[in-house]
């Protein structure tokens, strides 16, 4: 029966297969399968036809760790640069699966606490087991005792004991032992500040109201119109307030200023160290001055009290008494290129060091000496280029302007602790292309900005204004020699530029100034006219080294030159009033501040010449060698504004202080019954008297 069923099933299957083949319309031969028959492939009409080489070509696939879904163009705002910046690096991490685990590290605090709790639970379970085992042992021991008691009770009649009471006491003892837990040993935690957070409901702090009584703030009604004059008045009031505050600051004593500064500053470790050093330096300065005062006591006594008694026997001759000699090792073999007294502190003077030799240019030095300490300068500044000139501001005596050999100008602030100039010109700000031979402070401009002038060999007279934190330049005039235009092949004309060497501004006429050149000419110029000169003087045959207006007489000026001459001029006349030949190149001249007829000149042969036109208008009343003739050459001279002394500098970096004898500073003699007249009017009349004599002689000739 089973074999027949299997056949029927197979027959039915083959019949069903034949029916399917007939239905599909495919002819299948006997003994073959469907999969072995060939099938026709169908291709789309736009399919690419590739060659065998293209089909066999291998393409390498590179797997990268970059996230394909990461953004490519993220832009964020940069507060530093103030613009939107493209973010180049983007985090490429992609999270595929994350699961929060419940494993705790053994070394962590939570792991230690859990381990400690497990040990506590295990210890309590062991103690319970020990207590139960002891209780069972006690019960087993009591059972035979009870049997023995019953036998004895049965044997001994009449001897009955209180057995139930004893049983109750034993049960109570067992219960107490079972109920008393075994206390494990306390283990100290490694961190006693461990705590577990527990949530609890607490009552929030209730709001409290506090009230107080006070006077209401005052109220005012204000109304005004904003117009031009109201704004101007407000600015004027503000300016007055600022000036008052400045005056208060100036009126404060230096000790109070120092205490306020020390209170305002927050001292760091470095600042405290620097303050300690400054305190030590101040103390060292005081000690140094005391030592020098004792060392140079005889010189100080001569400076104050000594007068040459031999002048009583010499009517028209005087002498120079050497006092102090100033020198510094760092400025050794650097020529003294400039001298200037401080207008406020009469014992302080500034010295500029550089070199006049074109082939031996080196560094420069700015030194400020005090007569109280001749051994070492009070201030010292160094520069990469040689300093050729300097000037100290009249109203701000801590500001020193200097001119360099490389054409730059700079301003030094003596109040600043650092050794660099506060302001300096650059090639972008219009610096000179040749050495700067002289600088002069002038009055502030309309906006109260500091202003000074400079002259250079490039032929430019430049006005420099300190606006905020930079130097702004304006070319006042360019020196052009007359009749010096040359034509070049292209048809253009070239003007020969004059080389300025010295200049000086008029004391009363603000716009007028004189300029000396290397060609020996002196030009009278104006700040208002930049295209032409007011007048031209054929002064010298060689370069003009100095030009100076007389401090008393407004028409008289003096010039000196390398042609050995010193000339005194009236600016209204083109010929000189006085000419003096000193038999050597004249480096510098200076008017005396106490007389309109006294001036000094220094020559390269090491001599200092002092003239007094009221005593002798033909020759010097003092002609004295100051330095060694063969070794040193005197370059500059300056009178002290108050004391009867002069300072001279040489080309070796030495500065010598000399005292004028009484004959070199004679005052008008007293006449019987008349008071001695003093003042500028007397000095002007004294010089006018001499000039009138010269004018009369010239008119006669």
UniProtKB/Swiss-Prot annotation:
Biased composition range(s): Acidic residues: 136-155
Localization per Swiss-Prot or TrEMBL: Cytoplasm, Cytoskeleton, Cilium axoneme
Spans annotated as Disordered: 1-45, 119-165
Gene3D superfamilies named in the record: YVTN repeat-like/Quinoprotein amine dehydrogenase (2.130.10.10)
Listed InterPro entries: Dynein_IC (IPR050687), WD40/YVTN_repeat-like_dom_sf (IPR015943), WD40_repeat_dom_sf (IPR036322), WD40_rpt (IPR001680)
WD repeat ranges, renumbered to this chain: 382-422, 431-474, 539-579, 581-621, 629-668
Keywords: Cell projection, Cilium, Cytoplasm, Cytoskeleton, Dynein, Microtubule, Motor protein, Phosphoprotein, Repeat, WD repeat
Assembly mode: Consists of at least two heavy chains and a number of intermediate and light chains. Interacts with BICD2. Interacts with CFAP45 and CFAP52. Interacts with CFAP53.
Protein family per UniProt: Belongs to the dynein intermediate chain family.
Name of the molecule in the record: Dynein axonemal intermediate chain 1
Organism: Mus musculus (Mouse)
Gene it is expressed from: Dnai1
């Amino acid at each position: 029966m089973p074999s027949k069923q299997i056949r029927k099933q197979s027959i039915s299957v083959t019949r069903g297969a034949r029916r399917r083949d007939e239905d599909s319309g495919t002819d299948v031969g006997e003994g073959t399968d469907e999969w072995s028959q060939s099938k026709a492939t169908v291709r789309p009409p736009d399919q690419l036809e590739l060659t065998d080489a293209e089909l066999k070509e291998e393409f390498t696939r590179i797997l990268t760790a970059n996230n394909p879904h990461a953004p490519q163009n993220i832009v964020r705002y940069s507060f530093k640069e103030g613009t939107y910046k493209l973010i180049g690096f983007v985090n490429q991490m992609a999270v595929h699966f994350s699961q929060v685990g419940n494993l705790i590290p053994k070394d962590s605090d939570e792991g230690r606490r859990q381990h400690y709790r497990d040990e506590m639970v295990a210890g309590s379970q062991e103690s319970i087991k020990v207590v139960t085992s002891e209780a069972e042992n006690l019960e087993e021991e009591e059972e035979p005792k009870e049997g023995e008691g019953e036998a004895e009770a049965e044997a001994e009649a009449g001897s009955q004991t209180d057995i139930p009471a004893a049983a109750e006491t034993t049960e109570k003892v067992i219960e107490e032992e079972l109920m008393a837990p075994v206390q494990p040993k306390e283990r100290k935690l490694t961190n006693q500040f461990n705590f577990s957070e527990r949530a609890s409901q607490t009552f929030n702090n209730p709001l409290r109201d506090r009230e107080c009584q006070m006077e209401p703030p005052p109220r005012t009604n204000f109304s005004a119109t904003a117009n031009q004059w109201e704004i101007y008045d407000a600015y004027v009031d503000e300016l007055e307030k600022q000036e008052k505050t400045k005056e208060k600051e100036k009126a404060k004593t230096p000790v109070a200023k120092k205490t306020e500064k020390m209170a305002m500053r927050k001292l760091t470790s470095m600042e405290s160290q620097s303050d300690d050093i400054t305190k030590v330096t101040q103390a060292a300065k005081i000690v140094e001055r005391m030592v020098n005062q004792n060392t140079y006591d005889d010189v100080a006594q001569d400076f104050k009290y000594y007068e040459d008694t031999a002048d009583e026997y010499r009517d028209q001759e005087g002498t120079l008494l050497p006092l102090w000699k100033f020198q510094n090792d760092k400025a050794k073999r650097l020529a003294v290129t400039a001298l200037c007294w401080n207008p406020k502190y009469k014992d302080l003077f500034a010295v500029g060091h550089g070199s006049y030799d074109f082939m031996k240019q080196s560094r420069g030095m700015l030194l400020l000496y005090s007569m109280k300490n001749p051994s070492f300068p009070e201030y010292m500044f160094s520069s990469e280029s040689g300093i050729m000139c300097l000037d100290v501001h009249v109203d701000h005596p801590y500001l020193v302007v200097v001119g360099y050999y490389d054409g730059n100008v700079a301003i030094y602030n003596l109040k600043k602790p650092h050794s660099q100039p506060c302001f300096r010109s650059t090639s972008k700000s219009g610096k000179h292309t040749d050495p700067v031979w002289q600088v002069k402070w002038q009055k502030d401009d309309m906006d109260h900005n500091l202003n000074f002038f400079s002259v250079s060999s490039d032929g430019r007279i430049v006005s420099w204004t300190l606006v905020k934190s930079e130097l702004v330049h304006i070319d006042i005039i360019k020196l052009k020699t007359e009749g010096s235009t040359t034509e070049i092949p292209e048809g253009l004309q070239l003007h020969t530029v004059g080389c300025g060497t010295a200049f000086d501004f008029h004391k009363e006429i603000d716009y007028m100034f004189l300029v000396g050149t290397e060609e020996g000419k002196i030009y009278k110029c104006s700040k208002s006219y930049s295209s032409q000169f007011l007048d031209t003087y054929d002064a010298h045959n060689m370069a003009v080294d100095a030009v100076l207006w007389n401090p008393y007489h407004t028409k008289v000026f003096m010039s000196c030159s390398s042609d050995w001459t010193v000339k005194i001029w009236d600016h209204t006349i083109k010929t000189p009033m006085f000419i003096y030949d000193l038999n050597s190149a004249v480096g510098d001249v200076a008017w005396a501040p106490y007389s309109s007829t006294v001036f000094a000149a220094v020559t390269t042969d090491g001599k200092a010449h002092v003239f007094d036109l009221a005593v002798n208008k033909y020759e010097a009343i003092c002609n004295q060698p100051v330095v060694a003739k063969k070794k040193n050459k005197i370059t500059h001279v300056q009178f002290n504004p108050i004391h009867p002394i002069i300072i001279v500098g040489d080309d070796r970096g030495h500065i010598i202080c000399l005292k004028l004898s009484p004959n070199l500073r004679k005052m008008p003699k007293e006449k019987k019954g008349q008071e001695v007249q003093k003042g500028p009017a007397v000095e002007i009349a004294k010089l006018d008297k001499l000039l009138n004599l010269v004018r009369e002689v010239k008119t006669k000739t």
